[in-house]
């Protein structure tokens, strides 16, 4: 029988995490499942709250903030289920979503991973999938994101068409991503050089390198509230993003990496090594 481990990595997001856990508990998946929380040394009382309020949830407490990639890797290694569903702590899981994701991936042996449609608190869909990250695709994705945020009619129409159709993008967001555990291990898990950002794009690239593909499944919807811990530490978040961006280009686009460094240095945004 298919089973799934639901993994949530958290850092100082106690309120969002408890809302996420409550959303799962309100309509538990019928698929045999286990929920695992990886706490990255939070100082907001998260470990105690999980132990006290969610005794059925397994808590993995790190002694330091190891980041999203390394936190997920630890949980994936320790899981014993066929599937692993990675969730951000700032998501709300709707009834039937976990079962639908397990069914979608389980029914398609050519797919290595799948992601649902992500929507914000206002119900607007997010751009939670895309082409392989590179200089031109990044420019296109960022321009599209800005136009969509401004509710530019052409951008809104294009995004709304894309989020309604199942397709095979190069990546889906790590905010909610389901993968077969065996495939995750075969791909080498997440590259833990990425503390925050780009790890999902890199992971999907590793999964695709075996000849498999990634699924976007719009029939399943998950709410993504977008991280409080990141909003509280915008400078740290920006540095983490830039470090991951540089690491990604050094790995996947080494000819472009020096140009990226020059660009970031001119902007005063080049992170320390």
Short names for language-model regions:
Residues 133-169:
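Short, flexible, basic/aromatic active-site loop/helix in glycosyltransferases
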């Amino acid at each position: 029988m298919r089973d799934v481990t639901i993994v949530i990595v958290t850092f100082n997001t106690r309120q969002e995490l408890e809302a996420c856990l409550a959303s799962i508990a309100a309509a538990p998946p019928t698929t045999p499942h286990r929920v695992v929380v990886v706490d990255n040394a939070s100082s907001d009382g998260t470990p105690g709250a999980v132990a006290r309020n969610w005794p059925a949830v397994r808590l993995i407490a790190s002694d330091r903030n190891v980041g999203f990639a390394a936190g997920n890797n630890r949980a994936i290694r320790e899981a014993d289920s066929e599937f692993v569903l990675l969730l951000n702590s700032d998501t709300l899981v709707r009834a039937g979503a976990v079962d639908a994701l397990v069914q979608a991936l389980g029914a398609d042996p050519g797919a290595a991973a799948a992601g649902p449609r992500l929507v914000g608190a206002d119900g607007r869909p997010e751009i939670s999938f895309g082409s392989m990250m590179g200089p031109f695709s990044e420019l296109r994705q960022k321009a599209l994101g800005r136009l969509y945020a401004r509710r530019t009619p052409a951008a809104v129409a294009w995004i709304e068409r894309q989020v309604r159709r199942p397709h095979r993008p190069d990546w889906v967001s790590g905010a909610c991503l389901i993968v077969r555990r065996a495939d995750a291990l075969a791909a080498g898990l997440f590259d833990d050089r990425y503390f925050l950002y780009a790890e999902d794009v890199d992971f999907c690239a590793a999964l695709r390198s075996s000849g498999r593909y990634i699924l976007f499944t719009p029939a399943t919807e998950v709410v993504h509230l977008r991280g409080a811990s990141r909003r509280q530490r915008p400078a740290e978040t920006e540095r983490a993003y830039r470090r991951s961006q540089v690491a990604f280009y050094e790995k996947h686009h080494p000819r472009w990496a020096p140009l990226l460094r020059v660009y970031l240095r001119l902007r005063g945004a080049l992170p320390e090594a």
